[in-house]
């Protein structure tokens, strides 16, 4: 997603990149400094400007970043207003709730963003007028639990790789490296946007749904967002 935004013309000042950044120079990486999601694909780490590493942030810090609360520890925050469209891509691990749904997004070994906390964050951002529209694209197990809490928040749309009760699956296998490199949700997302940056949200959801294997791609809060047939990714990828 970072590369797609850069290709669309956005500067690093318009992007907040939070990753652990523990792959490129990992001792077992046969190509130091290189991160790919397919054999022979481009080096996604090259030129990337990392704002924060996940291990350096708490989930409270994450909420402060979303709500524009700048500090010495958090110099880079979301400086948005009610006229801005905000795109969030989250790829990681998730856990189920006690009842199998409405779980959490794992943040670190000892921290997580619960569905309830995510819902509170969305409602607070909405009440403070921090976005015109906000699109969440979440690739994580049980991510539908977080998607559910977006219901009722005006202008928020959430598309998840799995429903609240199931895991999402890896898909892109490297025979050379003997590791899973990506997943069908993310690879389809990238291919769909790269081939048509103005793709409608309906068509994007449909492509994700039919191509993602092993889990059910879900979409939440459509009634409070707008027409999925006329609303497009162009609202997020086209420079103002």
Question: What are the functions of these language-model segments?
Answer:
Residues 1-240:
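Cysteine endopeptidase catalytic domains of the caspase/legumain-like
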């Amino acid at each position: 997603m970072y590369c797609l935004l850069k290709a669309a013309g956005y500067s690093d000042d318009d992007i907040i990149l939070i990753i652990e950044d523990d792959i490129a120079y990992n001792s077992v990486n046969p190509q130091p400094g290189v991160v790919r999601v397919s054999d022979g694909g481009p080096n996604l780490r090259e030129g990337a400007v990392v704002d924060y590493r996940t291990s350096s942030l708490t989930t409270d810090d994450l909420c402060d970043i979303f709500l524009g609360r700048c500090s010495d520890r958090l110099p880079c925050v979301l400086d948005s207003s009610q006229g801005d469209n905000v795109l969030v891509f989250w790829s990681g691990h998730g856990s189920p709730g006690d009842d199998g749904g409405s779980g959490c997004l794992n943040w670190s070994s000892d921290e997580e963003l619960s569905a309830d906390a995510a819902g509170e964050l969305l409602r607070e951002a909405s009440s403070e007028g921090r976005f015109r529209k906000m699109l969440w694209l979440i690739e994580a197990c049980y991510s539908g639990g977080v998607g559910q809490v977006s219901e009722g928040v005006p202008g928020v749309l959430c598309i998840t790789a799995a429903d609240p009760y199931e895991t999402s699956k890896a898909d892109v296998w490297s025979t050379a490296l003997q590791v899973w490199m990506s997943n069908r949700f993310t690879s389809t997302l990238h291919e769909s946007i790269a081939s048509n940056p103005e793709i409608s949200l309906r068509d994007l959801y449909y492509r994700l749904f039919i191509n993602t294997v092993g889990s059910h791609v879900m979409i939440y809060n459509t009634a409070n967002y707008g027409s999925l047939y006329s609303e497009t990714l162009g609202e997020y990828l086209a420079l103002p």
